[in-house]
């Protein structure tokens, strides 16, 4: 019998689940809106209902066909005990997600930080395959980070290692959900780029952004890049400012860890080469090891939006 696992990518905007095999192949997947805020128990039921419907719609039975369920969650995650100690974007603390979900599923459930799950996927089968030192930075609702250092996942004390979204890159800057000001994710997340794009649209009714997206509520990172590529000055300024902040945070990480590879994931990474072409010159200028023979490579995560699903499933594989 083929071994199959469910991987769940628990995001602030969407919950995505997929059925995955040992090699990281996704057989099927499905997603629903997270619709925060809500009580923990309600979100747990949403996760279960999503996985149950995914299996039923594709001819699988959770009890008989699935080995385990892996959850990739933002925040400080104790993978050994299956507890999310803190998740500022969800507003949860001491969330005993493993224990609670196992009661619903009736099979083993494992939980890991979502960015750690994503770097596991990239190291095992993605664009960091074969690396002993690699990072992933996910640009979504917030900014997440995962590190594979000297051949193993780095969790840190209190399971709060690589919360890169909460390094400060702008003193006394924008207020973050964590309580600090000027955090990386307030400037470099997909949400930040969306917010800045919408602000620019309000300030510049003449911008091409309006022609590409007449409904400002639907404006997002893609719209900003599309307008920039068409020569719109307003969009170009928005994107260039975003890139400067993103490069600032990435160079800080590169100078601390000197990884072989930094993988970029999350919604903004869908811009692929356009994103890399803007980033690389700034990083080349600021990287402390810019004169070294071997340089850190900035790449788009192979699995991109699927990295969370595959990585979460691989957490289950590692515990099988």
Model-assigned labels for residue ranges:
Residues 14, 117, 141-144, 171:
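Conserved A3 ("GATE") glycine/threonine-rich loop of ANL adenylate-forming enzymes
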Residues 1-68, 78-81, 99-107, 121-131, ...:
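ATP-binding/phosphotransfer module of carbohydrate and carboxylate kinases, centering on a glycine-rich
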Residues 9, 68-74, 136-142, 146-148:
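Short beta-strand segments
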Residues 109-113:
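General beta-strand structural signal in soluble alpha/beta enzymes
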């Amino acid at each position: 019998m083929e071994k199959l696992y469910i991987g769940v990518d628990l995001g602030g905007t969407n919950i995505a689940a997929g059925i995955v095999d040992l090699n990281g192949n996704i057989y099927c997947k499905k997603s629903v809106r997270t619709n925060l805020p809500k009580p923990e128990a309600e979100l747990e039921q949403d996760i279960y209902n999503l996985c149950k419907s995914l299996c039923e719609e594709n001819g699988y039975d959770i009890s008989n066909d699935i080995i385990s369920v892996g959850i990739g969650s933002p925040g400080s995650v104790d993978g050994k005990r299956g507890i999310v100690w803190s998740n500022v974007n969800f507003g949860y603390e001491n969330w005993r997600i493993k224990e609670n979900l196992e009661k619903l599923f009736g099979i083993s459930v494992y939980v890991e930080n979502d960015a750690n799950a994503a770097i596991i996927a990239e190291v095992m089968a993605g664009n960091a395959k074969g690396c002993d030192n690699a990072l992933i930075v996910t640009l979504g609702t917030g900014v997440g980070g995962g590190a594979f250092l000297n051949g193993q996942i780095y969790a840190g004390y209190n399971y709060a290692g690589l919360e890169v979204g909460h390094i400060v890159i702008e003193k006394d800057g924008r207020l973050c959900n964590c309580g600090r000001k000027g955090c990386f994710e307030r400037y470099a997340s997909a949400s930040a780029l969306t917010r800045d794009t919408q602000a620019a649209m309000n300030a510049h009714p003449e911008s091409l952004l309006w022609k590409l997206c007449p409904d400002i509520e639907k404006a997002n990172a893609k719209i900003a890049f599309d307008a920039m590529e068409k020569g719109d000055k307003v969009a170009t300024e928005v994107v260039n400012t975003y890139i400067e902040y993103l490069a600032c945070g990435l160079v800080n990480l590169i100078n601390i860890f000197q990884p072989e590879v930094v993988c970029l994931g999350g919604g903004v990474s869908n811009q692929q080469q356009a994103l890399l072409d803007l980033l690389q010159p700034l990083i080349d200028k600021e990287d402390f090891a810019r004169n070294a023979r071997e340089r850190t490579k900035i790449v788009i995560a192979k699995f991109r939006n699927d990295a969370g699903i595959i990585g979460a499933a691989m957490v289950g594989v590692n515990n099988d």
